[in-house]
Amino acid sequence: MEKKTLSDIATQGKRVLMRVDFNVPLDENKNITDDKRIVESLPSIRKVIEEGGRLILMSHLGRPKGKVNAEFSLAPVAARLSELLDCPVGMAKDCIGTEVMQQVLALQDGEVLLLENLRFHAEEEANDADFAKELASLGEIYVNDAFGTAHRAHASTEGITHYVQTAVAGFLIERELRYLGKALQEPERPFVAILGGSKISGKIDVLENLFKKVDTVLIGGAMVFTFFKAQGYEVGKSLVEESKIELALSILEQAKAKGIKLLLPTDVVVTAEISADAESSVASIADMPNNLIGVDIGPETAAAYRNEIIGARTVLWNGPMGVFELDNFATGTIAVAQALADATAQGATTIVGGGDSAAAIAKAGLASEITHISTGGGASLEFLEGKELPGIAALNN
């Protein structure tokens, strides 16, 4: 379903209430340690300011548990946003109430006001109707540009849309829908999905939905050991979800029945302990040492996976190939990241969904060489599972 976006509406002279994701990390001195999320929302913000709209921004930060807590104030965000925009950004003391309404009504064309943390009110996460209605009264147009919270039906993402006539997607959400949506609806083929991570249970719904769309699935991360155990291999001390062995077998059978090429590693990196200075070696799946742990895909597997990725026209990656947080076990994950960048250079559409894979791309220094890196962890996952995201479903068609 096509959604109306910020491009479809005129904001000049209008009060524009925009839900953004300013949930940024702060150090103990309230300094923002990574402003990526603020930077990502700038195109939508600038469009409203440049058109002469009166912009009211709202977001959550951290988990203040429905109470006012100065530690989670958005004041540092207002200061950083002001620097990035090179114009003043007003900071409200709350997100509802008479004083806030006065500040909103005093806004001139092209001015910006940031509301205080939505989650200082328990009503936000409870999707309370009265709270949503009060938020809605602040604006004449509602824009949602917070993909990271689109899978939650909260007052500022879903409830609010019942009390506004115009509810549209910002540029960030538009971009997510364009790339994730196209991959699931009408991908250019061959379509290769790479799934990693430690547990099959976390990826089963994604796998089952992707089986309706993909040509090839490459599997990495610790979840491979549950598949190997299901096939009767010894996996040493590697992580296995014993309760998911039947499920692993049924996934392999489903892939076969649907004519999907599903590849598992042929070799893995093994170690006695998971630490930054641990020794490691490569073992083939057929003879894994019984006292070691598998922590990454091996070089033979990395080369085979690269071939599949390079030959694809659409590539979707969710989840690392191993314990990539430690440099000594990051080789397989970095190799996959590089293969994605090379496929992109050859004209493929490459999409990275979820926090860990995005972190791996950043670690490899390849973020600018991928078509689209999704900004939502849980939201991307639910989208890939084929679920409807309440924050997006609620916007105008």
Swiss-Prot record:
Localization: Cytoplasm
Swiss-Prot/TrEMBL GO biological process terms: gluconeogenesis; glycolytic process
Any Pfam family matching the protein: PGK
GO cellular component: cytosol
Family statement drawn from the similarity comment of this UniProt entry: Belongs to the phosphoglycerate kinase family.
Protein name: Phosphoglycerate kinase
Pathway it works in: Carbohydrate degradation; glycolysis; pyruvate from D-glyceraldehyde 3-phosphate: step 2/5
Signal peptide (from-to): none
Molecular function terms from GO: ADP binding; ATP binding; phosphoglycerate kinase activity
